[in-house]
Swiss-Prot record:
Spans through the membrane: 83-103, 109-129, 150-170, 218-238
Single Gene Ontology BP annotation: endoplasmic reticulum tubular network organization
Keywords: Membrane, Transmembrane, Transmembrane helix
UniProt subcellular location: Membrane
Record organism: Dictyostelium discoideum (Social amoeba)
Protein's name according to its UniProt entry: Transmembrane protein 33 homolog
Topological relation to the membrane, as annotated: Multi-pass membrane protein
Length: 290
């Protein structure tokens, strides 16, 4: 009697086959193995002509995730480079828009300079606090962060201040010296330019000290500006609160204000100082210190 053909074999009614397969899912492969072992030893598998489906096993998923993982890893440095580029552009915009405002007096450039500064200060804040959940601890740290304080500074004059070059000076000075440090290494091939920029950069400490002085004296400018409609009470009040915040958390601001306080004390102690001024100065200092 001839051996049964593989394709026509009655698999369903073979009790040994059912026991052989058990719970396996590769039915066709097991059929071929069983047929060759128990029915026709000369049977040759036709798997080499059968197209297999792509595996959806866990190993395949693992491989897929492992190939996407480096992409996710690479995305972060790319995003960091994007942020750095945005920070540089923002710093440049502060410089250019301040110069444009100085030349033209157009308030449009004044507000653009403030927006550029806001972006420039916001990027380091994002880098510092990225991924943090909003809570009281985060709010407390933001208040102490100098970049966050400068964002507050920009917002004060964007919403409450009239356009004035003096309000842009601190941001301009900080941005200018930031960019100077970036540009100098690229001027090595031109010694004259490099030496010139390095000389300018050597004035960094004096320039920053001047920016701090402007930042402090703005409160006086805003106060006296009330009488010429250049300023308003709300601006003076908000900026004074900002300055108290800076005094609390910035050592440079605190040192400069203390320096001014000593100068006022020396002037009030001078014999030529009018008595009423000498008497009113301690009262003013008491009110300001509250």
């Amino acid at each position: 009697m001839s051996s049964p053909k593989f394709d026509s074999y009655d698999w369903e009614n073979d009790p040994n086959w059912k026991e052989f397969t058990g719970t396996s899912t590769s039915i066709n492969k097991l059929k071929e193995e069983y047929f060759k072992k128990n029915i026709d030893p000369n049977y040759k598998s036709s798997n080499n002509t059968t197209t297999q489906r792509p595996s959806t096993s866990s190993s395949s998923r693992t491989s897929s995730s492992s190939t996407s993982s480096p992409r996710a890893t690479r995305a972060k440095p790319t995003f960091r480079r994007f942020l750095y580029g945005a920070w540089v552009i923002a710093q440049i915009s502060v410089i250019l828009f301040t110069l444009f405002y100085f030349i033209s007096g157009n308030p449009y450039f004044f507000y653009k300079a403030l927006l550029g500064a806001t972006i420039a200060y916001s990027i380091p804040i994002f880098n510092t606090f990225e991924g943090r959940k909003p809570d009281r601890a985060l709010a407390a740290q933001l208040v102490q962060d100098e970049n966050a304080q400068f964002v507050f500074y920009c917002m004060i004059f964007y919403f409450f201040g009239s356009s004035s070059l003096v309000y842009l000076l601190p941001n301009f000075i900080y941005s200018f010296f930031h960019m100077l440090k970036i540009v100098i290494p690229y001027t090595s091939s031109v010694p004259f330019i490099k030496n010139l920029l390095e000389k300018v950069n050597s004035t960094n400490a004096k320039a920053i000290d001047f920016a701090i002085s402007v930042e402090i004296n703005i409160v006086l400018i805003a106060f006296f500006g009330i009488f010429s409609s250049f300023s308003n009470i709300l601006l003076v009040f908000i900026y004074f609160r900002y300055l108290k915040l800076r005094y609390q958390f910035s050592q440079k601001i605190k040192s400069k204000i203390n320096e001014y306080s000593q100068m006022v004390d020396q002037l009030s102690a001078h014999p030529s100082c009018p008595t009423f001024i000498r008497n009113i100065i301690p009262k003013i200092k008491m009110v300001l210190s509250r």
